[in-house]
Curated annotation (Swiss-Prot):
Positions of the STAS domain: 543-795
Gene: SLC26A8
Post-translational modification: N-glycosylated.
Main location per the UniProt record: membrane
Source organism of the structure: Homo sapiens
The protein's name: Testis anion transporter 1
UniProt-listed GO biological process terms: cell differentiation; chloride transmembrane transport; chloride transport; meiotic cell cycle; oxalate transport; spermatogenesis; sulfate transmembrane transport
Length: 970
C-alpha cells in the first residue's frame, strides 16, 4: 500500500513537471489612487451605519438571531454539544471503563489529601466537594478528558495559610502526628477556625477565577507557546514525584513553601531516609513494574485503542490483601483516626479572614487556573479539538466556590487521573460523571475498606502516569535546533518553576513569553531584493545566484510590523544602503538657511517689524535639523535642512493639467505668477526659489548669487539611486510613531532627489495612513503600488537622460509638456497603450535638453518633438502614438497659447521666441507623482487646456540611452 502511494505521488510530481503552467497578464500599472478610482471599495461595516429602527422588535432582530443565540448557549453549556453528538455504541464502553478507573483512584487520593495538605478535613466533605466539582465541570467545562479533583500540590500551597491559625501548635504542619483530645473547647475551637481559613481561601480563589474568566483573561494562555506549557507541566511532574516520596519511603517530613522549597524538601528526605519502610518500597516497585508491563497490552474496541485498566485491578487487589493481612506499611488509617468528624454540614465562609489570605488566594488562583488550561490544551492537542480557556476559568471558579461550602481545599485538574481517563478510553465528560458517581458511592458505603490500602500503591500509580511529562527534557537538543527562542523559554520556565515555586515560575513564564513574542514580532528584518531574470518575482539577493539588481532602484522588504521600536532601524538601513549618513546642522548653517529664505526680503536684516493682516502661515508638519552626507565624499554629498511642511491644496478649482506640473517650480512660472505671488500660500521647501522671490523678481545673476550662499544645496548631490521601493506586503501594522518617522524618511529622501515608493500595502495599512493624515500634496497615494513589479515599472518609466549621455550644466533648462484630462480624452494622438507589458518596444519618457543656454527669466513657448529611447530590457510597454506632422495652423495655435499666458509688465524684452520648436513626448495619461505647484488663477486654469512648464536642471541624473545624444539643437 505504501509503495502504491509513493508511486502515485511520484507520478503526480512527474506529471506536474511535464505540464508546466504559465500566465500572461496584460494590465496597467496600478498605484493605490488609480486602483481605487477603477475599483470601488465596499462600504465600511464599522457599525456606524444610519439604520432606521422603529420598534423594539426590529431593534432586537437587528442584533439577535437564532444562530447567535444557539452559539451563545453552546459556549456557556458545552455539554449540550457533546450530548447531541454522543456515539453510544462507540464511546460508551470506553467511558465506563475510564470512569470506574478514575473513581477508584480518586478514593485513596481523597483519603491521603489530609496527609499532604497537613489539614484534618473530613473525608466525606472532600468526597462531596469532589462530586459537585466534577458535575459542574461536566456542565461548564470544555475539555473532554479532564478530571477535576483536589490536587495535592495546590493544597500544599495552603501551608502558608495554615500558619495563620494553627490548631495544634503547628505540630501537624511540621509533620508530627500526635493524637490530641478534641474534647477540649480551645482545641475544638482552633480546629474549626483552621477549617474556616481553608474554606475562605478556597472561596476567594474561586471568585478570582470567575473574575478572570468573565474578563476574558484566558487569552494569556494563547501567548504561551507549546514549549512553555511543556516546561511548566514537566516542573509540576517533578514536584509531584517529590511529594510522593513520603508514600514511597513511608516517612514524614516538614514541607516547605516558597522559593527553593524544592531543594529544602530534598534535603529533608535525605535526612529522614534511614527511617524508610522497606515494605512500602517493595509495594511501590511491584506497582511500577505491573504498570510498565501493562503498556505492552493493547486492546481496541470498534477500532478505538483502549489500555487495559491495570490501575483498577491494582487498587482492588491490594485493598483486599491489606484487609486480610497486616502489610506493615504506611496507610491513611493513622490520619483518619485523628479526625473528630466524618462529615461536617456545609457553611458559608468567614469573610472577615479575606484581608489575611488575599495574597495566598491570588497565588492559588493563578496556579490552579493555568495548570487546568495547560493540561486541557495538552490533552486537546492529542485528540484534535480546541478548548475555551475563558470557559474553563469560569468552570473551575464555580467548582471552587461550591467546594468552599464543604470546607474543602482548592480544586483543579488532576494530572494523574486525567491521564488515566484518557488512556483508558474516555472520549467525553460522561467518563468524569461516571467516575464522580463511583467515587461518592464507594466513599459513602465502602470507604472504611480503603483505609488500610498502602499509600505506596497510590504513589506508584501517580508516578507511572506523570513520568511521560518528563520526556520533553530529552527533546531539548532537537528543540534547540528547531527554535532557539522556544528552547530558551523552556529552560527559563522549567528552572524558575523548580527554583522559585510554581506560582512565581508561572508569572516568570508568562512575562518571558510576552517579552520574547514582542521582541520577535517587532524585530525588524529588512531584506534587499532583486529580480529573478525574465519574471516579475523579487527575492533576497543573498538567496539566489542568478538574481539581478536594477540600476538606480533599491528594493527593501520589511518583514515585520513598523513600530516605534524598529522604525529607526529601517531608517538606518536605508541610509546605509545608499551610502549616506545623517549629520546634525550647526547653528550658523541653520541661520544661513533662514537668512537666505526669509530675511533677504528686507535687505539682510535680522530683525524686522511689519503689519500683516492675513492668516498666519501654518506651522510645518515635521521638523528636524539634520542633513545627509555621503560616506565617501561628505563635501559633495550634502543636502539642505530637512524641513517638511504639510502640503495642502492651494486651489480647489485647479484642472487636471495643473496637477501634473513638475515639483521644481521653474523661474518662468514664477515670473508668470509674479503678479499673484502675494496671494499664494508659502511652503518652505529646499531650493524653492518661489520662497525667495519678491514681487519684483531680481535678475538672473542676483538669484544665482543668492543660491550660492546656501551652504548645503542639493544641486551638488549626485545620487546613484533615484528610487527606493519599500515592500510592505508582510507589514500588518504601523503605529503612530512609525508613520511620523516614515513620513520623515519619504521627505528626507525626496529632498535628496530620491523617490520613495511603497508596494504591497494591505488595505488596513492604507486606512491607517488615511486616519493619521499621512497623505498630502507632497506624499500622495500615487506613491503606493499594488505590487513590487508595478513600482519597479513606474520607477523605470520616470528615468530621464542623465549626465552619462547628455552634458547638462546648471544653466540648461528642461521643458515638459502636460495636457489636461479633457484634451487627452478627445485627441487620439495623445493616447497610450492600456498596458505596460507585452510590447517589443521599450520607450521611456525623457526630457529634451536645450543645447543653448537660455536666460533664466525668459519666457519660452516651445513645442517639443517626440523621441524614443531604448529601455533597460524589462517588460515595459509605453506605447505611444506619435504626434502627426504639424499643420500650418500650428503657428496660429502657438500664438493663441502665447497670448493666454500672463505677460510680465516690467521686463517684456526678456521673452525671446525661438524659431524652431521640436515636439515633445506624449506622456502617459497618469498621475503617479503629483507635485506641489503654486496656485494659478481660477479663470486661467479653466480655459487653459494645455500647459507648459520649464524646469531648472540643478544637477545631472543618471540614465540609460543606447542611442547617445540624439537631441536636436534648438
Amino acid at each position: 500500500m505504501a509503495q502504491l502511494e509513493r508511486s502515485a505521488i511520484s507520478g503526480f510530481s512527474s506529471k506536474s513537471r511535464r505540464n508546466s503552467f504559465a500566465y500572461d497578464v496584460k494590465r496597467e500599472v496600478y498605484n493605490e489612487e488609480t486602483f481605487q478610482q477603477e475599483h470601488k471599495r465596499k462600504a465600511s461595516s464599522s457599525g456606524n451605519m444610519n439604520i432606521n429602527i422603529t420598534t423594539f422588535r426590529h431593534h432586537v432582530q437587528c442584533r439577535c438571531s437564532w444562530h447567535r443565540f444557539l452559539r451563545c448557549v453552546l459556549t456557556i453549556f458545552p455539554f449540550l454539544e457533546w450530548m447531541c453528538m454522543y456515539r453510544l455504541k462507540d464511546w460508551l464502553l470506553g467511558d465506563l471503563l475510564a470512569g470506574i478507573s478514575v473513581g477508584l483512584v480518586q478514593v485513596p487520593q481523597g483519603l491521603t489529601l489530609s496527609l499532604l495538605a497537613r489539614q484534618l478535613i473530613p473525608p466525606l466533605n472532600i468526597a462531596y466537594a469532589a462530586f459537585c466539582s466534577s458535575v459542574i465541570y461536566v456542565i461548564f467545562g470544555s475539555c473532554h478528558q479532564m478530571s477535576i479533583g483536589s490536587f495535592f500540590l495546590v493544597s500544599a500551597l495552603l501551608i502558608n495559610v495554615l500558619k495563620v491559625s494553627p490548631f495544634n501548635n503547628g505540630q501537624l504542619v511540621m509533620g508530627s502526628f500526635v493524637k490530641n483530645e478534641f474534647s477540649a473547647p480551645s482545641y475544638l475551637m482552633g480546629y474549626n477556625k483552621s477549617l474556616s481559613v481553608v474554606a475562605t481561601t478556597t472561596f476567594l480563589t474561586g471568585i478570582i477565577q470567575l473574575i478572570m474568566g468573565v474578563l476574558g483573561l484566558g487569552f494569556i494562555a494563547t501567548y504561551l507557546p507549546e514549549s512553555a506549557m511543556s516546561a511548566y507541566l514537566a516542573a509540576v511532574a517533578l514536584h509531584i514525584m517529590l511529594s510522593q516520596l513520603t508514600f514511597i519511603f513511608g516517612i514524614m517530613i516538614s514541607f516547605h513553601a516558597g522559593p527553593i522549597s524544592f531543594f529544602y524538601d530534598i534535603i529533608n528526605y535525605c535526612v529522614a531516609l534511614p527511617k524508610a519502610n522497606s515494605t512500602s518500597i517493595l509495594v511501590f516497585l511491584t506497582v511500577v513494574v505491573a504498570l510498565r508491563i501493562n503498556k505492552c497490552i493493547r486492546i481496541s474496541f470498534n477500532q478505538y485503542p483502549i489500555e487495559f485498566p491495570m490501575e483498577l485491578f491494582l487498587i482492588i487487589g491490594f485493598t483486599v490483601i491489606a484487609n486480610k493481612i497486616s502489610m506493615a506499611t504506611e496507610t491513611s488509617q493513622t490520619l483518619i483516626d485523628m479526625i473528630p468528624y466524618s462529615f461536617l454540614l456545609p457553611v458559608t465562609p468567614d469573610f472577615s479572614l479575606l484581608p489575611k489570605i488575599i495574597l495566598q488566594a491570588f497565588s492559588l488562583s493563578l496556579v490552579s487556573s493555568f495548570l487546568l488550561i495547560f493540561l486541557g490544551k495538552k490533552i486537546a492537542s492529542l485528540h484534535n479539538y480546541s478548548v475555551n480557556s475563558n470557559q474553563d476559568l469560569i468552570a473551575i471558579g464555580l467548582c471552587n466556590v461550591v467546594s468552599s461550602f464543604f470546607r474543602s481545599c482548592v480544586f483543579t485538574g488532576a494530572i494523574a487521573r486525567t491521564i488515566i481517563q484518557d488512556k483508558s478510553g474516555g472520549r467525553q465528560q460522561f467518563a468524569s460523571l461516571v467516575g464522580a458517581g463511583v467515587m461518592l458511592l464507594l466513599m459513602v458505603k465502602m470507604g472504611h475498606f480503603f483505609y488500610t490500602l498502602p499509600n505506596a500503591v497510590l504513589a506508584g500509580i501517580i508516578l507511572s502516569n506523570v513520568i511521560p511529562y518528563l520526556e520533553t527534557i530529552s527533546n531539548l537538543p532537537s528543540l534547540w535546533r528547531q527554535d532557539q527562542y522556544d528552547c530558551a523559554l523552556w529552560m527559563m520556565t522549567f528552572s524558575s518553576s523548580i527554583f522559585l515555586g510554581l506560582d512565581i515560575g508561572l508569572i516568570i513564564s508568562v512575562v518571558s513569553a510576552f517579552f520574547i513574542t514582542t521582541v520577535r514580532s517587532h524585530r525588524a528584518k529588512i531584506l534587499l531584493l532583486g529580480q529573478i531574470p525574465n519574471t516579475n518575482i523579487y527575492r533576497s539577493i543573498n538567496d539566489y545566484r542568478e538574481i539581478i539588481t536594477i540600476p538606480g532602484v533599491k528594493i527593501f522588504q520589511c518583514c515585520s510590523s513598523i513600530t516605534f521600536v524598529n522604525v529607526y532601524y529601517l531608517k538606518h538601513k536605508l541610509l546605509k544602503e545608499v551610502d549616506m549618513v545623517k549629520v546634525p546642522l550647526k547653528e550658523e548653517e541653520i541661520f544661513s538657511l533662514f537668512n537666505s529664505s526669509d530675511t533677504n526680503l528686507q535687505g539682510g536684516k535680522i530683525c524686522r517689524c511689519f503689519c500683516n493682516c492675513d492668516d498666519l502661515e501654518p506651522l510645518p508638519r515635521i521638523l528636524y535639523t539634520e542633513r545627509f552626507e555621503n560616506k565617501l565624499d561628505p563635501e559633495a554629498s550634502s543636502i539642505n535642512l530637512i524641513h517638511c511642511s504639510h502640503f495642502e491644496s492651494m486651489n480647489t478649482s485647479q484642472t487636471a493639467s495643473e496637477d501634473q506640473v513638475p515639483y521644481t517650480v521653474s523661474s518662468v512660472s514664477q515670473k508668470n505668477q509674479g503678479q499673484q505671488y502675494e496671494e499664494v500660500e508659502e511652503v518652505w521647501l529646499p531650493n524653492n526659489s518661489s520662497r525667495n522671490s519678491s514681487p519684483g523678481l531680481p535678475d538672473v545673476a542676483e538669484s544665482q548669487g543668492r543660491r550660492s550662499l546656501i551652504p548645503y544645496s542639493d544641486a551638488s548631490l549626485l545620487p546613484s539611486v533615484h528610487t527606493i521601493i519599500l515592500d510592505f506586503s508582510m507589514v500588518h501594522y504601523v503605529d503612530s510613531r512609525g508613520l511620523v518617522v516614515l513620513r520623515q524618511i519619504c521627505n528626507a529622501f525626496q529632498n535628496a532627489n530620491i523617490l520613495i515608493l511603497i508596494a504591497g500595502c494591505h488595505s488596513s495599512i492604507v486606512r491607517a495612513f488615511e486616519r493619521n493624515d499621512f497623505f498630502d500634496a507632497g506624499i500622495t497615494k500615487t506613491q503606493l503600488f499594488l505590487s513590487v513589479h508595478d513600482a519597479v515599472l513606474f520607477a523605470l518609466s520616470r528615468k530621464v537622460i542623465g549626465s552619462s549621455e547628455l552634458s547638462i550644466d546648471e544653466s540648461e533648462t528642461v521643458i515638459r509638456e502636460t495636457y489636461s484630462e479633457t484634451d487627452k480624452n478627445d485627441n487620439s494622438r495623445y493616447k497610450m497603450s492600456s498596458s505596460f507589458l507585452g510590447s517589443q518596444k521599450n520607450v521611456s519618457p525623457g526630457f529634451i535638453k536645450i543645447q543653448q543656454p537660455v536666460e533664466e527669466e525668459s519666457e519660452l513657448d516651445l513645442e517639443l518633438e517626440s523621441e524614443q529611447e531604448a529601455g533597460l530590457g524589462l517588460d515595459l510597454d509605453l506605447d505611444r502614438e506619435l504626434e502627426p506632422e504639424m499643420e500650418p495652423k500650428a503657428e496660429t495655435e502657438t500664438k493663441t497659447q502665447t497670448e493666454m499666458e500672463p505677460q510680465p509688465e516690467t521686463e517684456p524684452e526678456m521673452e525671446p521666441n525661438p524659431k524652431s520648436r521640436p515636439r515633445a513626448h506624449t506622456f502617459p495619461q497618469q498621475r503617479y507623482w503629483p507635485m506641489y505647484h503654486p496656485s494659478m488663477a481660477s479663470t486661467q486654469s479653466q480655459t487653459q487646456t494645455r500647459t507648459w512648464s520649464v524646469e531648472r536642471r540643478r544637477h545631472p541624473m543618471d540614465s540609460y540611452s543606447p542611442e547617445g545624444n540624439s537631441n536636436e539643437d534648438v
